[in-house]
């Protein structure tokens, strides 16, 4: 078997994010590819007799060997999704996720192994819970999954980082890692030709064509229905099972079920379809306005502000097409908040007990009502709504 060695070195102070690959290409020679991550490699050839010497030299210079974490995925395909609109939806979301990965990482999904994902999650959890927010942990993360960075320092935290900056970095890396993991889980295997990707994921997505149901969806959206393009009913078996088990265990009733909105960028939507809205049990419990939870909105307008739709107020979207989730959630005794205080950043499931959700009312602290859930079993997917700008719907793209 041909020898391969893959090494990474990050030097933030010099804005250097370097890689060094050694690849045996014959019985007597090996090829070296080296350079800045994300740039075209500089290539040279050497006799195989100097392999060990060169390898040790690079390790002594501070390069980290990432070879064992690499995995090679075989090239297979999934069975085609029959419904045209559903196939188009999944294709678009895969493309959006793939583009985000390509613009942020210098490794492809096929070069990432489950071990790399697990190790990356461990590093991110260490960083999230480290009170000093040591940048060396971020450097380890960037070395494990090499990133495209024009200026490494831009991706690290300044010495005087505020809590919002810290949370933004954690959210950024969490979103990217979930995207990478979802794309990796979408790679077909040997028996994939017998299944669609949706079947592999225990996921059912069907277009909503019933006029009564469509009217109900639009009415619930209020003035935001102007952006409505189409809707799909989503059934994620894993999340649905967790939801109904929680529902039965806690003796909820039909009137305790609510349908609220959740908005996210296009690049995150495939991961949400696959995983649902899930909470990391190892994540820090502070940093968000009402603690670490699942944030939902009774009004579509608020959640649309977090989508990729052109003009979205919170993430400054630029896309003519975006997606909004309708989540089915259950609670019956919310903790009502009318005025926010800084101590609410550390709210948790146990701290609001015996209440089972936070309902933050619009007023002095918020423009719109907000609902926060601290147990992801209380939430499952109901619809994904396709949004389009009014100009696009009128054919003025």
Where are these regions (language model features)?
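Intrinsically disordered, low-complexity terminal and linker regions
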Residues: 1-31, 36-45, 49-268, 373-397
């Amino acid at each position: 078997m041909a020898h391969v060695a893959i090494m990474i070195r990050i030097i933030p102070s010099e804005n250097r994010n370097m890689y060094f690959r050694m690849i045996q290409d014959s019985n007597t020679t090996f090829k070296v590819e080296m350079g800045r991550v994300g740039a075209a490699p500089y290539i040279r050839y050497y006799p195989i007799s100097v392999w060990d010497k060169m390898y040790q030299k690079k390790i002594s210079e501070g390069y980290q060997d990432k070879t064992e974490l690499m995995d090679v995925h075989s090239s297979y395909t999934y069975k085609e999704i029959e419904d045209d609109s559903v196939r188009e939806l999944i294709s678009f979301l895969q493309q959006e996720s793939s583009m985000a990965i390509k613009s942020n990482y210098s490794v492809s999904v096929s070069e990432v192994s489950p071990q790399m994902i697990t190790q990356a999650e461990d590093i991110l959890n260490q960083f999230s819970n480290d009170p000093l927010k040591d940048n060396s942990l971020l450097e380890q993360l960037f070395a494990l999954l090499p990133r495209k960075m024009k200026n490494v320092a831009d991706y690290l935290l300044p010495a005087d980082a505020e809590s919002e900056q810290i949370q933004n970095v954690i959210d950024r890396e969490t979103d990217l890692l979930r995207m990478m993991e979802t794309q990796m889980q979408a790679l077909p295997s040997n028996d994939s030709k017998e299944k669609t990707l949706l079947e592999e994921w225990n996921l059912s997505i069907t277009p909503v064509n019933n006029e009564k149901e469509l009217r109900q969806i639009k009415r619930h959206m209020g003035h935001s229905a102007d952006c409505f393009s189409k809707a799909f009913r989503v059934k994620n078996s894993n999340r649905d099972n967790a939801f109904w088990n929680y529902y039965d265990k806690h003796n909820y009733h039909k009137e305790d079920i609510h349908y609220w909105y959740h908005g996210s960028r296009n690049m995150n939507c495939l991961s949400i379809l696959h995983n649902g809205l899930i909470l990391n049990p190892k994540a820090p419990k502070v940093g968000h306005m009402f603690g670490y939870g699942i944030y939902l909105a009774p009004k579509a307008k608020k959640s649309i502000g977090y989508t990729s739709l052109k003009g979205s107020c919170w993430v400054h979207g630029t896309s003519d097409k975006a997606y909004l989730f309708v989540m089915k959630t259950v609670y019956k005794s919310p903790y009502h908040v009318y005025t926010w205080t800084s101590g609410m950043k550390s709210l948790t499931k146990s701290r609001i007990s015996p209440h089972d959700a936070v309902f933050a009312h619009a007023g002095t602290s918020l423009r719109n009502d907000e609902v926060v859930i601290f147990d992801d079993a209380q939430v499952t997917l109901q619809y994904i709504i396709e949004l389009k700008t009014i100009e696009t719907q009128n054919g003025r793209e």
